[in-house]
Design a protein with these regions (language model features):
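Substrate-binding cleft of carbohydrate-active enzyme catalytic domains
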Residues: 198-212, 216-222, 253-259
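Short, contiguous, pocket-lining structural segments
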Residues: 188-195, 211-216, 249
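Distinct, well-ordered alpha-helical segments
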Residues: 153-157, 219-229
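Alpha-helix-loop-beta-strand connector modules within alpha/beta enzyme cores
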Residues: 188-204, 223-233
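N-terminal hydrophobic targeting/anchoring segments and the immediately downstream early-domain regions
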Residues: 21-190, 239, 243-314
Length: 314
């Protein structure tokens, strides 16, 4: 039964709402996915709307011509709680401008809600999401991509928690003052920095999730060792499809994540599973089959799906 549910979930999140693609999922699976989507709460761990809207304003409370997320498409696809990514580029890692940008992007999400309180609501707890689901609202929880705005100050961590941030992706495309990045060959800290280890403890104390997407393998294992709470990979995929690419997680890491009680939201698009970005459906079928293999190695609760809308080519 759990395996059948996992296979349905692949179609549920991958097939729903993806229009204009060369290939289509079988009609029976699509119908089943649509039925489940209307009754279940669907969470997406990482959607890059705030940075997109801040860079080039568009009203996502209405249908939009570009991008991958707006209210009508979210409703059509059954998406209930997309985490709004408060993304800060690595170029701002050593600048207080990172704090300013993070606050501005949070303001952007709050403005979206203020513009359409009959459509969206900020969510800071699971209870918020469940209540808003019953009210017919799309919940907008907040996650910070790149911990640069913390700037080595736990007071900033508290500030952003108070503003609604409920997870932090420790690093992004470069190593920062918290953690080494999977993309950065320099590996400055050989995992987490001394401050990064302190930060893990305080995030646990606050009840803020630790996101290990983008971090190096060493940093991942150090987080698993230090964290007293389950951690997440908000938008990563499986290294089986991309041998040698540290951005994705290998089977040993998935086992460790499962033992921690955490979850990986598997990014199923573009170069995360295939160099040929437009062959997404064939690779998705392969991902479904590999998912079944991974179920034999880790807990079913460890695996989920994630689209990284706006940043990923499908």
């Amino acid at each position: 039964m759990k395996h059948r549910t996992s296979v349905t979930a692949v179609y549920l999140l991958a097939a729903l709402g993806l229009s204009g693609c060369a290939a289509k999922p079988p009609a029976t699976e699509l119908t089943q996915a649509q039925r489940i989507a209307k009754s279940a709460i669907i969470v997406d761990g990482h959607i890059d709307v705030p940075y997109r809207v801040n860079k080039h304003w568009v009203d996502v409370t209405q249908a939009t011509a570009d991008g991958d997320f707006d209210y009508p498409r979210a409703v059509q696809g059954g998406l209930n709680a997309p985490f709004m990514s408060i993304y800060v580029p690595a170029s701002l890692d050593n600048s207080k401008a990172s704090i300013q940008l993070a606050n501005t992007l949070i303001d952007t999400v709050e403005a979206i809600v203020a513009r359409a309180p009959d459509k969206f609501a900020i969510a800071t707890t699971v209870a918020d999401v469940r209540k808003q689901f019953t009210q017919g609202l799309i919940s907008l929880p907040l996650g910070m991509e790149n911990g640069s705005p913390i700037q080595g100050d736990l007071g900033n961590l508290q500030h952003f928690y108070n503003r609604g941030i409920r997870y932090i992706t420790l690093a992004h495309s470069q190593s920062n003052h918290i953690s080494d990045s999977s993309y950065d060959i320099r590996k400055r800290w050989q995992g987490l920095s001394p401050f990064g280890k302190t930060l893990i403890n305080q995030m646990n104390n606050l009840g803020m999730l630790i996101d290990i997407s983008h971090v190096s393998d060493q940093a991942f294992y150090q987080v698993i060792e230090l964290s007293r709470a389950p951690v997440i990979a908000s938008h990563s995929s499986i290294r089986f499809f991309t041998p040698g690419w540290e951005r994705n997680m290998d089977q040993a890491m998935l086992k460790a994540l499962g033992a921690n009680g955490g979850v990986i939201m598997i990014n199923f698009g573009s170069g995360f599973v295939s160099p040929q970005a437009r062959q997404w459906w064939d690779r998705l079928v392969a991902l479904r089959e590999q998912w079944a293999v991974e179920f034999g190695q880790t807990s079913p609760e460890t695996l989920a799906l994630e689209a990284e809308y706006r940043q990923t080519n499908l």
